[in-house]
């Protein structure tokens, strides 16, 4: 396998293509974001999206709302012709039902969060597109997706099946140690590529992985130190990284990795929604 280009270089290439295509239009894509409370992870993500939009010349409207007003703001964005994309940033307050995602206009649901959205969820799409760009061969691989959320784990598993992988899905009720070493699986090492997509930071240490495996860390959260962390411990990430040159394996971090790929797909989906409106 050839060496992967750095994620930031890949993102720069894709952004340059978007900038070039945008020159054909007199107006600009407009993304609207709704978020809640004081959540450092949400605040960080919203700031990152604003930075991306500023770089590409998109309009960006981010509104921090009271939970009781969330539906009215979604309705307002839905009815505003100049708003092409809408996202509702998780986590949601307890008083806001998940059905709010289904209230987004499917043609504006650029995060792929609602059941009728015309767009694919950004996180799995971003990861798969990056791997494809680098010539990663999926066909025939044994893939394990750890996590079964509607916007990451499940759609990711479907994409991998469509790419002719043999897919195993684990989740919060799985006994990972037993599942990944069961007779059916032969051993944990029979998994060629593993995607961690759970809501627990630094959950996986190096003992979970084999040196030859490709590890894609998708989960993100704020640690006690106030910083973003992925599903892998720092030691596990470093441990796997040491083997990438020797075994031509791949390891991608959630921090500075899959999170950036998610934002890139959000930009692409917003541009698609914009073009559909022209």
Model-assigned labels for residue ranges:
Residues 38-48, 121-214, 218, 223, ...:
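Glycine-rich phosphate/diphosphate-binding loop of Rossmann-like nucleotide-binding domains
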Residues 69-81:
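Short, well-structured alpha-helical segments in soluble
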Residues 4-5, 12, 85-138, 202:
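Anion-binding alpha/beta catalytic cores of soluble intermediary-metabolism enzymes, centered on
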Residues 35, 87-91, 146:
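Short beta-strand segments
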Residues 1-27:
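Positively charged, low-complexity intrinsically disordered leader regions
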Residues 100-109, 216-277:
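Rossmann-fold NAD(P)-binding glycine/threonine-rich loop
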